[in-house]
Amino acid sequence: MPRHHPLLSLLSIVCVIFVAGCERYAVTLNERPIYTPKVIYSGYNIADPALASCVKQALIEGNITQPEQLEILNCSFAGVRDLSGIERFSQLKTMNLSNNQLIDIKALLFLGELRQVNLAENPAINCMDIDTLEELLSNATIAAPVCNKPL
């Protein structure tokens, strides 16, 4: 029966803890990279500061390294006015944009993977834009402000 060395076990545990604790750092050996951590995606341009802040937080929390990885975005009560630039995240499936100051939602028309969109409590959104969004995303569930449509 092989003899188990406690020192070897302890060294193994220390190595695992060290590597796990350094996942955010590049590891090199003789100046050659052994491990380089993935960088959070930042190649987007969103003009609205509230939306940019919300997207940045979602990218950090989800450890998103590519725009296609972002599938859920919750920006309710964020003060978002403009959605320009959100189309960069083409794989978004769920968006909560309720209780903001949105007027124009045309950027959502470029997000063909959307399955759930909450636009409630954004009273200034154009009803025609909501109708267009519902037509283009016929498989999606869209919660939108009540529109007074002519009879």
List where the protein language model places each region.
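N-terminal capping/linker segments that flank leucine-rich repeat
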Residues: P2-L7, L11-I13, G21-S76, G85, ...
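Conserved LRR concave beta-strand detector
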Residues: I72, Q91-N96, Q116-N118, N139-T141
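Conserved "Asn-ladder"/turn position within leucine-rich repeats
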Residues: A78, N100, N122-P123
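Fold-core signature of tandem repeat domains
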Residues: V80-L83, L102
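Acidic-histidine catalytic/liganding microenvironments
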Residues: L83, F89, L111, N122
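Charged, surface-exposed interaction regions in soluble eukaryotic proteins
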Residues: Q101-A107
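Non-cytosolic head/periplasmic domains of membrane-anchored proteins
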Residues: G112-C127
